[in-house]
Amino acid sequence: MRYRQATYYAALAQRALWRTLPAGQPLQPSDIKQLYSDELRAALAADFALSFSLTQIAEYTQSDGTAPLIITDRERWAAARAHALVYDIVQPGCDITHSQAGIDALCTLTHDPQTSLSSTIHLCDARLGGALAQASGRALGQLEQTIYCLIDSAVAQDDTPWHLAKLLSPATDGTIIPIIQLRPKTLLATLSTYELLALFIGYGYEPRIVDCTTADPRQSDADYTAALAWATERTAALRQPAQLRPHKARRPLLLVRTPEQFETLLDDDEAQEDSLDDNGDVQPSSIARAQAALAHRKADGADSSWARTQAWLTQVLAWCEPENLFDAAGNLTFAETKALPHTAAAHADNDHANSHTAQLTAQTPALVATPLRRPAIEPYAVVATPPGTQRSNTLSRVGSYLADLAKDAAPDSFRLFISPSLQSGTLAQCFASQPRAWQWGSQPSIAPHASDGYTMSYPAAGALRGMQLGYLEQGRQSVFVGASVHEDMSAASRSYTAALASQPSSTSLPSLNTILSHQSAEQVTNALDQRDAPTTVYFPADSNCAVVTPDMMLSSTQVINVLHASDTTQPTWLTTKAARAQMHAGLATWNFASHTSPDIVLAACGDIATTEVLAAIELITHSCPAARVRCVNISSLTPRGFGTLAQPVSRRTLARTVTTTKPVIIAYPGEERSLAATLFAYGVDGRQFDIHSFGLAPCGDTLMTSLINQQASRYDLAIAAATCLSATGVISSDDAQRLMEHCRAAIEQCLAHAREHHTDHPMVTTWQWQRGQ
């Protein structure tokens, strides 16, 4: 119990001193800087419940000699870190005394909790499916892995993808034991025993309730240990041969009613605010009671809430007994020690110790990215000579490449994660015949399913993302495929960046690879807005560039790769050799459509933009032969600039490519502000650049209609170029007016045809590059 109280105290210190570093003294109520206590109370209640379970798992796993992996929500960083920290402190060779160094060590803060606190405790993002999603990814193909998912009841009732267990095979995948902390004043805690069992049986589990609210703590410990042993036995029974397993294998799940010592403090404080009913009965402890108490406290105002916070924290501190954490000699001591076993502490012996301050080091087993045999690119290429004469769907060859890669890869070295947003289009058709992993009877969708399927799909894209993160953190490679208008990269980027920070410098984490179809301007900006994330967004100009890109993505490590293309049929411009050079360079001049001494530069980013820019160049040179135009292609961007993280574009290269004096018109499939920020970072004159941004939303418009409405079509680009060329005196005002009138007439033709036939005009769909032929 003393060990638990030490971790409670450390967690309390971290929570309460979030913005105030410890000054070398034990935590005092006066250190609290928060006016409202409700959020702090809820966090500490969850932290203390987690600390209780960590202690129980530690004792159980020590008895059988196993090395578990414990995954919990990142919001529980204070409890997880406190538990690991206190364990480090009690190790041999770590002499923590009742001094400033000792108290500072016990109250160590983490303002940026990473994903791994040790080789045992792992933190995850609740927005990506939480502990269960990442545990499911880690367990894929890892039969010997045992993972305990500690899930707070507030998270379990809303954000946990419970059906993910139906994707895992008991015979080939690792053991996952979900443990739900049933805290009072949460929705699940209001359910009766029958309702709880019925709920999780319906989810596909075999639940068992562990009641640890008894007065005798030894009985709680014994019940918890027995439940963990039962869960281990039930999992072992599911690993018998398939013909002996039940058709629907229900995995064990524990529902723990946690001790209420801490909750009693809450109830005692709230009892002063709650009134008795008319008949003298006390209002039941429920969600309604918690909401009523919260409303009452807020009505009292900030001053009284602050005062109650101080009084309440005084009770909590007294219960934690911080003054008894040290013995008469000033050393941290416990009457009963239940330490969480992990390899984070690497302390020297007492005779050789050179430091008296405990340090929590995140030491995880060295990861080695699984080698992956990738198919040759050439069989998937489209003939591209002369440029622009052949048309192909930009992502069709990518789908074929990935499907063959998944089929021929070594067992469990590669997985495809297909988002539910990918419902239509050529890319979706490429994966339609790929069997999805499924272990639970009837198929949940029209796509084929199989118990040995290696393609993962789940209705919640966030949970699928979390599963991918767990999978790659085991050193294995993967690709997430979805439609960009429905995906949000921010949570995945933050979680992956945190995972990178947790890895030792000697390890290489496989890249987080994503392919997004149906270009969304918001998602391009979203990916590039993550300034601290190691992100590269690829914009292939055609199908050959697109099929080269996955090969580059899968050969990289420690990077967030995003391939962003339109899933539409576009001309093919580059051979595979030229495509590879373009994608590696990130920014290049296309000589076949350029003049060496240009009067104006037209730049394209992505497949649709490339077609529109080249069509605009043809319009300009046909109407105004005297105009000298340069065509530039932008094939990759990072939050830091043009190019890739491995090969960024320098200021000198940018100036040489787009010139420093000539006007530049850019067609860009993202929000204008993101590209403007990139150009600003290069220190260029913003007046030189005219950005025509666009996005493709599923609004029912044809492609050309959508581009015209956003002033990003070939005709809008040609009009903008004519305006610039006329202003600089390259062409006469009559030539400029003639070109603009021609373009406006073409726009009217396209819009009229789309209104009548609901398709784009043939002069758009059958257009071919003619210059130089």
Would you name each region that the model predicts?
Residues 510-519, 528-531:
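Conserved catalytic alpha/beta cores of large enzymes that bind or transform nucleotide phosphates
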Residues 74-77, 151-158, 181-186, 213-215, ...:
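Acidic, glycine-rich active-site loops and adjacent beta-strand->loop/helix elements
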Residues 66-70, 146-148, 175-177, 206-207, ...:
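Beta-sheet entry/capping signal
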Residues 29-35, 41-171, 428-430, 466-474, ...:
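Cofactor-binding active-site loop characterized by glycine-rich and histidine/acidic residues
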Residues 85-93, 142, 161-172, 268-273, ...:
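A glycine- and small-aliphatic-rich helix-loop capping segment at beta-alpha/alpha-beta transitions
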